[in-house]
């Protein structure tokens, strides 16, 4: 791709978004997908896989803070964390901020993503790959959760959309495997798309997760790069109380963790579980 051109996201057939490409840093087909990293004056460095924006320097903090701090602070004493995907390292960066976490395992199907992101998205990982608690496993996520002998307190599925290599991370086989290696009282979260435009994705995840967990729901955040409205995150656990903790408990855990965030705070934590009525209605109709 030439510089000073427009890059078109191809996630949706009938509409989409464009980014001006100021400088192409990397563009190559890895073993699994087409990967491009380019610079844009408004959003900084942008990474896309198979024509779909995955992350940008400008707003990645919203996504990654909400995917990590919500489940980790709701759990309260997570020691072992599993990240599925997350090759750009930003999810890992946020998990390493929790000093009570003892082990962090990241399973990424594409070694190329990790290598390229270490070089071209250094602000995302911020040196977190060198954290002594971290272990990288190059494997398919479904295979890992169904074969591992490890167990985890929090599982974060930083999956792409349910197309290409990421499709398997929206299957019953994956959710069943996550339940298998999740400790009692543990929490599973996953990105579930922009519910206004990808409602079927959320409904499908809710239906499948409900076979394995007694408390299944969603929380949300507005992330500019993910076009079309609020992004939903799937939430699944067998401890229904964790979704309804008092603001005092979350506030105390937040301060004890010593976190200083750019988006997440205890008030956002509580508000994130308030969902639009159209999603409630769609879930009730299933």
From Swiss-Prot:
The reply to whether Cytoplasm figures as a keyword in the UniProt entry is: yes
List where in the cell it is found.
Answer: Cytoplasm
Which positions fall inside the PABS domain?
5-238
**What's a GO cellular component annotated to this UniProt protein?**
cytosol
State what this protein does: Catalyzes the irreversible transfer of a propylamine group from the amino donor S-adenosylmethioninamine (decarboxy-AdoMet) to putrescine (1,4-diaminobutane) to yield spermidine.
Q: Which PANTHER family match?
A: SPERMIDINE SYNTHASE (PTHR11558:SF11), SPERMIDINE/SPERMINE SYNTHASE (PTHR11558)
NCBIfam families given for it?
MFS_SpdSyn (NF037959), PRK00811.1 (NF002010), speE (TIGR00417)
Q: Protein name, please?
A: Polyamine aminopropyltransferase
Name its species: Salmonella newport (strain SL254)
Q: What broad taxonomic lineage does this protein's source fall under? A: Bacteria, Pseudomonadati, Pseudomonadota, Gammaproteobacteria, Enterobacterales
Which gene is this protein's source? Answer: speE
């Amino acid at each position: 791709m030439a510089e000073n051109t427009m890059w078109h996201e191809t996630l949706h057939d009938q509409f989409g978004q464009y980014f001006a490409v100021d400088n192409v840093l990397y563009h190559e087909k890895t073993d699994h997908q087409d990967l491009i990293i380019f610079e844009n004056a408004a959003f900084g460095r942008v990474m896309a896989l198979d024509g779909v924006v995955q992350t940008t320097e400008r707003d990645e903090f919203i996504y990654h803070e909400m995917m990590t701090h919500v489940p980790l602070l709701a759990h309260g004493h997570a020691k072992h964390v599993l990240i599925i995907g997350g090759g750009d390292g930003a999810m890992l960066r946020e998990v390493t901020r929790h000093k009570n976490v003892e082990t962090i395992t990241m399973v990424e199907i594409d070694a190329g993503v990790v290598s390229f992101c270490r070089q071209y998205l250094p602000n995302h990982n911020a040196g977190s790959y060198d954290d002594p608690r971290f272990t990288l496993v190059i494997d398919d996520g479904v295979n890992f959760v169904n074969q591992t002998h490890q167990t985890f307190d929090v599982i974060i599925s930083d999956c792409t959309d349910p197309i290409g290599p990421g499709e398997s991370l929206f299957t019953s086989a994956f959710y069943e495997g996550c339940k298998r290696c999740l400790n009692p009282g543990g929490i599973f979260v996953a990105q579930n798309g922009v519910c206004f435009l990808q409602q079927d994705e959320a409904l499908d995840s809710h239906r499948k997760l409900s076979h394995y967990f007694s408390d299944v729901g969603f929380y949300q955040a507005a992330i500019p790069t993910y076009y079309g409205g609020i992004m939903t995150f799937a939430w699944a656990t067998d401890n229904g109380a964790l979704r309804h903790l008092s603001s005092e408990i979350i506030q105390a855990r937040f301060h004890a963790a010593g976190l200083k965030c750019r988006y997440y705070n205890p008030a956002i934590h509580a508000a994130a579980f308030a969902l639009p009525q159209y999603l409630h209605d769609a879930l009730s109709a299933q």
